[in-house]
Amino acid sequence: MQQVSCGTLVLNSARQVLLCHVTGTASWDIPKGLQDPGETPLQSAQRELFEEAGLDFDAGLFEDLGEFAYRPDKRLHLFKVEVGEELCNLDHLRCTSFFPHQRTGEPTPEADGFRWASREELSSLCWPRMASRLLSIDW
């Protein structure tokens, strides 16, 4: 059975998408993660957005973009939230989801930076599979 990873495309007024820098890599990603038992896809997307970026939006702001093929063992269920000038500065965003550091075992945030990116930048910032999937969606 395929796992479902739920994520959110947070878009600003310039139609740029919010990306989180994946700690310990050169790649950026949208806030997303596996759906927990008992969660709806929307609840999962909201939780992941809060854990990975500290953003808490009302459920009514999320537009369901649907479920998409991603990997043989995983599908993506994506949502979209459009924001205005309230998010032009990303300095206050914080990741509160941690994993043990590979060498030290110290708690390490999943994301250690945030930025806005245009569609044209996705291929150079994201993993190829994610960039391809995001570019295939009309947002």
Located regions from the model:
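Short, compact, well-ordered microdomains
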Residues: S123, W127-M130
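N-terminal strand-loop-strand
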Residues: M1-I30, F57, F79
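The catalytic Nudix box helix
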Residues: I30-D64, F79
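Active-site-adjacent beta-strand/loop module that shapes the phosphate/pyrophosphate-binding cleft
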Residues: F68-R103, R115-E120, R133-D138
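Alpha-helical transmembrane helix bundles of large polytopic membrane transport and channel proteins
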Residues: T104-T108
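A generic structural signal for short hydrophobic patches within well-formed alpha-helices
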Residues: Q35, L122-S123
